[in-house]
Amino acid sequence: MSNPTSTTHHNIEIQSQDVIKLILQFLKENSLGNSLTALQEETGINLNAVDSKETFLNDVKNGNWDSVLTVVSTLRLSTTLLMDLYEQIVELLHLKEYELCKYLIRKTEPLNYMKLNQQERYLKLENHLQREYIDLGDFYKYGITTEKRRKQLIEQLNNEIITVPSSRLLSLLSQSLHWQKHQGIIPDDCMEFDLFKGEVPFKKIESEEEQITTVLDKTIKFNNKNKPETIKFSPDSKYLLTGSMDGFIEVWDYNTGKLSKSLAYQSNDDFMMHDDAILCIAFSKDGEFLATGSLDNKIKVWQIKSGKCLRKFEPAHTNGVTCLQFSRNSTQILSGSFDSSLKIHGLKSGKALKIFRGHQSFVNDCCFNHDEDRVISCSSDGKIKIWDAKSSDCLQTITPTSVVTVRDISIRSITILLKNPEFLLVCNSSQISIVSMKSQTISKTFTSENSKTFLVCTLSPLQNYLYAVDEDNILYTFDFNSGSLLNKFKIHDQEVISISHHPTKNLLATTGSDCLLKIWKSNSNDNINN
């Protein structure tokens, strides 16, 4: 093992030797003697700590040698001190513990060392053992009594051993968890925590049986300066987030329709924010991290629990950032922009790793495919492009042909289908289509009445239902499998800007130019077949 070094965290130097000592103490307290010995030998670092120095030294003072030798076996003391300690077994001879003395004299390492290096001293012990008798007054040097000899040993031991509180490793970990709770990094109601991964164990959240949303549940009012430009439910089902015109990112409790009180930074009016309007929001798969893109060309990455900005890309593009997606392992972010390009950014390096150029207008949406070896994008130029994620080469462009009836008009969004990832749900202005990426053919279409333009659309979590809003602010609900229209009604008085479905509940959030955010729920008495 290499020599331990020190590590500096926020100007506090942490010695690696101290970390090893914490582990040594843990091994000792949990009776893992073999591991304790192996780690001490490999690192050359010794614990030399006792639970209670006072108790240990009192055992020496009172001649409780069974307790003393048990503790000493876990320490790394100097050879001189060990020989002095083991020599004190003459007291056991005085108590006629002959067999024990014989074992200690002939089988222990300190006395074997004495035999090889201080023969006269060793033979003195051996001779007394053979006679099975000892006069301690004759054995000690002139004027030394048993009590004085024990006092000398106590002084020697006092210089080589230390005492530390028990369970230091667990205590420090506990303090760390309490601090993270105080900072909002760990939820207050958290009862389990994976120390190794540094996260709350993932628990699968049971999804409600999917039903269409028809009933207005909550309404949140904004004004023209702070109205949301984008909204999204978190994948861990906890929050609804809004990104607003004034640059604020707010985390809402969708059950109450109010700002979440579980996040300390929001309670202190310390919000996540940009200097300009927020255009897009994306979550990491586990919901721990948030990426936001703004009109002033910037991307910021946040930890939702603490509200801290972890990474900035300034600028990320030469124009506003319109769409974002995390890679599956949350180490990269894919972005699209008004500047017609896409980029992959590295969260560790803080740099753009790849750039994709080829669209002739705004990039409106982008995503990785399932294997993350392809990037898929759509644009206001009416084209869908499929890119090689490593080389940045455009591998395929889906454009109108005599076979493909997708019109050469703005494509607002794309969604990969769960059951068949070779197909895309494509939201065009005039219709919503299911398009094969291989054949570039349309297998199904969804249209509004009187060919009204679609503004936004989203799928239910299991992709049983398609929700789409047209320019008259009518919400259309389609059976995604059959294509039949199940319901339609007006949801806003002005243009709908953004839409998001809850990942496990029958909740749909919408926001519009009327400065309202509305949350819709299902009515369990609805007969969706009517």
Curated annotation (Swiss-Prot):
Start and end residues of each CTLH domain: 49-100
SUPFAM superfamilies given in the database record: WD40 repeat-like
UniProt keyword annotation of Repeat present: yes
One Pfam family cited in the UniProt record for this chain: LisH_TPL
Cell compartment(s), UniProt: Cytoplasm; Nucleus; Nucleus speckle
UniProt cross-references to InterPro entries, sorted A to Z: G-protein_beta_WD-40_rep, LisH, SMU1, TPL_SMU1_LisH-like, WD40/YVTN_repeat-like_dom_sf, WD40_repeat_CS, WD40_repeat_dom_sf, WD40_rpt
CDD domains: WD40
Cellular component GO terms, alphabetical: cytoplasm; nuclear speck; precatalytic spliceosome
UniProtKB keywords: Cytoplasm, mRNA processing, mRNA splicing, Nucleus, Repeat, Spliceosome, WD repeat
GO process terms (BP): mRNA splicing, via spliceosome; RNA splicing
LisH domain: residues covered: 15-47
Main localisation: cytoplasm
WD repeat ranges, renumbered to this chain: 223-262, 273-314, 316-357, 358-397, 449-490, 491-530
Family: Belongs to the WD repeat SMU1 family.
Purpose of the protein: Involved in pre-mRNA splicing as a component of the spliceosome.
Subunit comment: Component of the spliceosome B complex.
Name the record gives this protein: WD40 repeat-containing protein smu1
Organism the protein comes from: Dictyostelium discoideum (Social amoeba)
